[in-house]
């Protein structure tokens, strides 16, 4: 009988990535298979997020539900990871006696060892340290699950915005070596991945060591990734305006693999609030970045993050945010009402904005962004869009689902052979959260760059050597 693993994940895309690595780690080294049913699992892992208010209480409520499962099965192992574990490790140990393992984002690679400690009788094994980039050296080889993949290029953040817990829960910025990233992406490309999304709390702060001891910038990394055979699209998230430098903007001008879509959080359009947030830039500097981006890449679309009701936010401050939204023409946003995070400088500021006022402002902002997004979508009517087909449609499995460069989901009638490839579709209808497409042509009719996968290169070398025609020279 196979051993079962259940993972519940809350929070950002980095957490989703970490959870997938936990599954790979325990699957390869200990033979666990994933299950959606917590009641049949031998190990339960909760990967937590501390960004939103009452994150800790949400964790304890979930652990209370899992405790009933452990009461029935004393051999059940329960682990808590992620940012709440980093922040509240001792509190979890004290309040939730059912928890066996507490680990941070940087120590998930030690899970097999921690599980063995529990099996030997140790109680509440805790490891929430920050051992820099060690975890990537201990993870199994990447495994593709479809034509798109996430690849972590760095961990942590050193910006210390006044509202944010990330530097305290994930540590300061640490970049992975260039060669490790390129190898992982090449392995994914060999498995059929066509699009990679480079992950980090602040990806444009990437400074990775190279094999010769020099440092690779984020702009240089983007060009290296674009040169990998099989990779035809590159996305990245998340970035910070103060390090969105001209060399990164230049990549948009000469690297077509980099999509015409950027998520660049601004949080507020008010200079006064940006200063209180310790963002390190003003609204005019953000607008300058977007202006230069649109000069380098015509038609690029921008999404952002907004915090509504930050302590001291006045009606004038909010008006500045709405003005910025109109000037930039954001296509999408992640917008939230401010919630104080314990241990951050902003938590000590007087929260003097009425909650009803916050809710009204949030509704106004989200309504404006939705209007702008629909306007962009309507402009796509009748155009031909190149999409990467990711799989069957969510609502109708007899149809296919793909994604445009500007991150819109398109559903269309097509053949299963198109999954994992690019197709051109004409946009024939527009909905709030998706588009409707009509199939025009498949990849075999496109003028795409000919990709030579590593296996083909090796086969060609072997054939040439056997024939004595050529000799491979690196």
Swiss-Prot record:
User: What's the source species' lineage?
Assistant: Bacteria, Pseudomonadati, Pseudomonadota, Gammaproteobacteria, Alteromonadales
Kindly name one Pfam family recorded for this protein: UPF0004
Domain TRAM, by residue range, is 378-441
Primary role: Catalyzes the methylthiolation of N6-(dimethylallyl)adenosine (i(6)A), leading to the formation of 2-methylthio-N6-(dimethylallyl)adenosine (ms(2)i(6)A) at position 37 in tRNAs that read codons beginning with uridine.
Where found, per UniProt? Cytoplasm
Q: What quaternary arrangement does the UniProt entry report? A: Monomer.
Q: Name one GO cellular component term.
A: cytosol
Q: Which residues bind [4Fe-4S] cluster 2?
A: 157, 161, 164
Domain (MTTase N-terminal): residue spans on this chain: 3-120
| InterPro entries xref list | Elp3/MiaA/NifB-like_rSAM, Methylthiotransferase, Methylthiotransferase_CS, Methylthiotransferase_N, Methylthiotransferase_N_sf, MiaB_methiolase, rSAM, rSAM_horseshoe
Cofactor needs: [4Fe-4S] cluster
UniProt remark on cofactor binding: Binds 2 [4Fe-4S] clusters. One cluster is coordinated with 3 cysteines and an exchangeable S-adenosyl-L-methionine.
Cystine connections: none
- All copies of the Radical SAM core domain together span 143-375
Primary location: cytoplasm
What are the binding positions for [4Fe-4S] cluster 1 in this chain? 12, 49, 83
MF term (GO), any: N6-isopentenyladenosine methylthiotransferase activity
| Protein name in the entry | tRNA-2-methylthio-N(6)-dimethylallyladenosine synthase
Q: Please give the SUPFAM superfamilies that the UniProt record associates with this protein.
A: Radical SAM enzymes
Similarity comment: family membership = Belongs to the methylthiotransferase family. MiaB subfamily.
- Keyword annotations: 4Fe-4S, Cytoplasm, Iron, Iron-sulfur, Metal-binding, S-adenosyl-L-methionine, Transferase, tRNA processing
Q: What is its EC number?
A: 2.8.4.3
**According to its UniProt record, which reaction does this protein catalyse?**
N(6)-dimethylallyladenosine(37) in tRNA + (sulfur carrier)-SH + AH2 + 2 S-adenosyl-L-methionine = 2-methylsulfanyl-N(6)-dimethylallyladenosine(37) in tRNA + (sulfur carrier)-H + 5'-deoxyadenosine + L-methionine + A + S-adenosyl-L-homocysteine + 2 H(+)
